Amino acid sequence: MSGASLLKETGPREVFCGLTSIVWLHRRMPDAFFLVVGSRTCAHLIQSAAGVMIFAEPRFGTAILEERDLAGLADAHEELDRVVKNLLTRRPEIRTLFLVGSCPSEVIKIDLARAAERLNSQFNGKVTILNYSGSGIETTFTQGEDGALKAFVPLMPSSDKKQLLLVGTLANAVEDRLITIFKRLGIENVDSFPPRQSTELPSIGPETKVLLTQPYLTDTARVLKDRGAEILPAPFPLGVEGSRLWIEAAAKSFNVDQSLVTSTLEPLILRARKALKPYIEKLTGKKLFLLPESQLEIPLARFLHMECGMELLEIGTPYLNRDMMKPELDLLPDKTRIVEGQHVEKQLDRVRKNQPDLVVCGMGLANPLEAEGFSTKWSIEMVFSPIHGIDQASDLAELFSRPLHRHDLLNTKQLTST
């Protein structure tokens, strides 16, 4: 680890739950359906986050736990079987059904793993039924994707072919560009996970080299490693430098000549740095405080410091996997304060004490902090925005310059009016 100082905190948290990941997963795999076993609050959360009206028949829904279920007066498993049968009768195009656990279903101990096994035997291969937890009791919102991908891994076919596997949901256009770069480097067998169709799972084996695109896929990385795959250590593909090092990690693993890597990436890097310039001018010297929510905080901090010149006051992260994050930690400046976990009141006190120019935080904290005069950026925006890769570096920087620009405009307007 670099010279960063690490502090652990426990206490009250302010994060979304893992159900939120359904929003981007259901868009990624249009032949899959996500059935949350939860409360009306769970249903409202997903519908609001996705911005989809329920009459549009989205590829997610909620099996509502009523008071009778919570009190143990009804057989929740019988009710779940009935809901699933009705759903699959009405939506025969569903190829994969995820039963997604929630806080209520976990509190009353509904065994969704057993339910999935039972329903798989009933439907006899017509649809694949998997389960994972989206509960927020012990996890944060991005870990929903980790749970979903981990559930897929046992179904992935075995293969001995040498291949590169990109793991983690990316915007389709971004993924296509990255695959094109790898093919220019002579890496022909490139696949992605999750796939764009849930039935088209990539193969896995001892000749599979894995590049993680997201830092929150700890469990998925572990089970892929158990299947024989090699996880390539690299920073995550955020910003010019992170993306370059990420691509070079794959190139080195496939014995690609460094001169080819340089000639392929150099035009992209020059263009990206030119596009970054106006945002660097806005961000350089500004003080940054990241509250924990998405697990993207450390790669984002590295990008904003190394490439945009921001001063890092504190990096909060819900969980810190030191092995997975070592390439990122090694790039941070000495004495960077990293806080794993959260005691939200103590962290807010430190925000007020340090007076940052920009706070990256969850939606629930943004408005109160704005009311206190701080500029904020929602961390959830980083998950829904196409920010990965060299070409996207300026778009990523723009996301952080916007609130500062807005703050300047508001101050100018107030001065003019007075």
UniProtKB/Swiss-Prot annotation:
Binds 1 [4Fe-4S] cluster per heterodimer. The cluster is bound at the heterodimer interface by residues from both subunits. GO terms for molecular function: 4 iron, 4 sulfur cluster binding; ATP binding; metal ion binding; oxidoreductase activity, acting on iron-sulfur proteins as donors; oxidoreductase activity, acting on the CH-CH group of donors, iron-sulfur protein as acceptor. The keyword Iron applies. Its cofactor is [4Fe-4S] cluster. One of its GO terms (biological process) is photosynthesis, dark reaction. Pathway: Porphyrin-containing compound metabolism; chlorophyll biosynthesis (light-independent). Its EC number is 1.3.7.7. Keywords: 4Fe-4S, ATP-binding, Chlorophyll biosynthesis, Iron, Iron-sulfur, Metal-binding, Nucleotide-binding, Oxidoreductase, Photosynthesis. [4Fe-4S] cluster binds at residues 17, 42, 103. InterPro entries: LIPOR_BchN/ChlN, Nase/OxRdtase_comp1, Protochl_reductN. The keyword Oxidoreductase applies. Coiled coil: none annotated. It is an enzyme of class 1 (oxidoreductase). It catalyses: chlorophyllide a + oxidized 2[4Fe-4S]-[ferredoxin] + 2 ADP + 2 phosphate = protochlorophyllide a + reduced 2[4Fe-4S]-[ferredoxin] + 2 ATP + 2 H2O. Component of the dark-operative protochlorophyllide reductase (DPOR) that uses Mg-ATP and reduced ferredoxin to reduce ring D of protochlorophyllide (Pchlide) to form chlorophyllide a (Chlide). This reaction is light-independent. The NB-protein (ChlN-ChlB) is the catalytic component of the complex. Belongs to the BchN/ChlN family. Protochlorophyllide reductase is composed of three subunits; ChlL, ChlN and ChlB. Forms a heterotetramer of two ChlB and two ChlN subunits. This is Light-independent protochlorophyllide reductase subunit N. It comes from Prochlorococcus marinus (strain MIT 9211). The gene is chlN.
